[in-house]
Structures are given as structure tokens and as C-alpha cells.
Regions:
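Transmembrane helix-boundary elements of multi-pass transport/secretion proteins
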Residues: 2-83, 92-112, 122-137, 160-163, ...
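Transmembrane helix segments
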Residues: 37-45, 155-195, 199
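Hydrophobic transmembrane alpha-helices
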Residues: 56-63, 104, 138-142, 167-175, ...
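Transmembrane alpha-helical segments of integral membrane proteins
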Residues: 115, 200-210
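Hydrophobic alpha-helical transmembrane segments of polytopic membrane proteins
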Residues: 132-155, 173-176, 227-234
Length: 245
């Protein structure tokens, strides 16, 4: 990998995103609006908002980054941009790292907005450090970016990219512990939830919600989410295609 080529790719993607106001709105505003809506849904029960809102603070960025990244990457391939780039002395690793760096920068802004709004405007009450909450939200957004880059290799159209959401995101959403504690699930489902990265994203948020200090479980959860993001990025580089058949 070449750092200069990676940085150039990231800068190009960011320039394109600057002119795509709809994608920017989806990435930055949708998580904020969803958290605000959730706060007023549980207006009479702030404890419920605290428990669910902390988890969704990580889930919403993951979902939005997954959608935008998968569609944006596929659009580049169908338009022939990836084919032209890969015809140049630019490796697949440089390309994927550049995309990850660009969308990762957006993920930082997204996580700052969502976390700041939840804590200081919506009254989300967490026992632990706000910085740890921000860290998990950022890792979740980066995981969504990695998953989006990966699945874009298997889609032939933007519609197919969206269709991957029920296959990749919805099972994790159901089994992550948001709706029921994972240790109360049927053993097969609990075992399946143990290998899904979103489960550890929710667990990490729960650790911040209930513990004043950084715990060993929090470190484990954060490391697993980060490792999953790196693994999926590596798979994305391995499966990247020049063009859509």
C-alpha cells in the first residue's frame, strides 16, 4: 500500500461527497433525527430512552454508513470510475483504504453530532465517560463503512445494494440484544449472536451506560468491533471488482 495514493483516493471521494447533499444529509442528519424522535417517543419514560438510546446511538450510524458506502462504491464501479482507477498504478488495498479513510472522516463528524446531541440536548444519562460512548459510536460507524464496501462487490445495481440490508443488517439487529437479553435467547440464536459484530457494539454501549470506569468487557467489545471492521475491509479489498458485469 502507498500512503500518498491512499490519501489521494480519500481526497477525491470527499470532493465527490461534498457535491452529494443527499448522501451528506443521510449520513449526518438521519441518526440525529432518529434519536430525537426516539427521545420524544419515550418522553414519559426517560429510563427507557437511556437504555435503548445508548444502543441505538451505535446502531443508527452503522446502518446509515452501510447504506451510503455500499451505494456510493457501487455507483463508482457502474460508472467505470473504479475500472479507470485500477488501470492506473493503484492497488486494491490503496483504493479500499482511501474509501475507508474518506467515509471514516465522515463517520467521525457523524458520531460527534449524534453523541453530542444525545448527551447534551436529549438528556441521555450514562454513568461512564462520554468519550467512551463516542468511541463505540465511531467504531460502529466504521464497521458500517467496512460492511458497505464489502457488500458492494456483490451487487449489480443500487437496488441490489439496498437489498443486502435485510440480509446483513436485520439479523444482527434482531440478535444484538436490543430487544431481548442475548443470554435469554434460544441457545442456537445466542450462539449465532456471539459471532455477530453488532452484538458487541450494543454490549459496549451497555458497559458505558452502567459502569463509571472502563471495564475489561468494554475493551473486549471495542477490540472485537474494530477487528471485525479491519477484517471486512481486507475482504472488501480481496473481492473488489473493476466493473459490474
Amino acid at each position: 500500500m502507498n500512503s500518498a495514493r491512499t490519501a489521494a483516493t480519500a481526497a477525491r471521494v470527499l470532493r465527490q461527497l461534498r457535491h452529494d447533499l443527499r448522501s451528506i444529509a443521510l449520513m449526518l442528519l438521519v441518526p440525529v433525527l432518529m434519536l430525537t424522535l426516539l427521545r420524544f417517543i419515550f418522553d414519559g419514560n426517560p429510563r427507557t430512552f437511556d437504555s435503548i438510546g445508548a444502543s441505538l446511538l451505535g446502531i443508527f450510524p452503522l446502518i446509515t454508513m452501510f447504506l451510503v458506502t455500499s451505494i456510493a462504491t457501487l455507483r463508482e464501479r457502474t460508472s467505470g470510475t473504479l475500472e479507470r482507477l485500477l488501470a492506473m498504478p493503484l492497488g486494491k488495498g490503496d483504493l479500499i483504504a482511501g474509501y475507508a479513510l474518506a467515509f471514516g472522516a465522515v463517520a467521525v463528524v457523524q458520531s460527534l453530532l449524534a453523541t453530542g446531541l444525545a448527551l447534551w440536548f436529549l438528556g441521555l444519562d450514562v454513568v461512564g465517560s462520554p468519550w467512551l460512548l463516542l468511541l463505540v459510536a465511531l467504531l460502529d460507524a466504521l464497521l458500517g463503512t467496512a460492511l458497505g464496501l464489502f457488500v458492494s462487490a456483490f451487487a449489480a445495481s443500487e437496488f441490489q445494494a439496498v437489498q443486502f440490508m435485510p440480509a446483513v443488517i436485520f439479523p444482527q439487529l434482531l440478535l444484538c440484544g436490543l430487544f431481548a437479553a442475548r443470554n435469554t435467547m434460544q441457545p442456537v440464536l445466542e450462539g449465532l449472536s456471539n459471532v455477530l459484530p453488532m452484538s458487541y457494539a450494543v454490549d459496549g454501549m451497555t458497559q458505558v451506560l452502567t459502569h463509571t470506569d472502563m471495564t475489561a468487557d468494554f475493551v473486549r467489545d471495542a477490540v472485537i468491533v474494530a477487528a471485525c471492521a479491519l477484517l471486512v475491509l481486507a475482504l472488501g479489498a480481496a473481492t473488489l471488482r473493476r466493473r459490474t458485469p
